């Protein structure tokens, strides 16, 4: 199986590598050497590389090359996006899978897996930002020219919205979660002013009627 990884420990950054092409024609070995040069960056011992994602290759002065194999040139440069994560987090994911009787072929950043599932090639080409809102984190992946430009994780998720609803409406957490799912709206203008919802109170008090627009705002 392929196991997904996410969380606030995930970090992404851009790097590049440059090599001299041997023989005047780009070979698989040249591409491998360029990628090795790009990933030759200092990474803390408690982190590991999850992905090295090529953004573009440059052969001499030709930019924007997706696959330089077989091209003539003397200088090969590659720009990459490197994703790293905590070693212990990756190990715990693998161990959990093994305990369930599953063999892990590889670990994949969840936002990249989501992008493969929901984004079209055209969207990735013209530029798009994928935002995956989870319970505790918000995963972000930005694409342009059909390559990854940025990945990031915000320590904010659906649970934060639930907490805000519970605090703002003085209602239990379980009730706040149900209200969010059933009545939540991201744009207040899309809610009719005559829409009302029932909000349970804490401490056994009577439930209250509240405008749905107040919730959306």
Predicted feature descriptions by range:
Residues 1-130, 147-149, 169-217:
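Nucleotide/phosphate-binding catalytic cleft detector across ATP-hydrolyzing
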Residues 126-168:
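Glycine-rich phosphate-binding loop of actin/hexokinase-like ATP-binding domains
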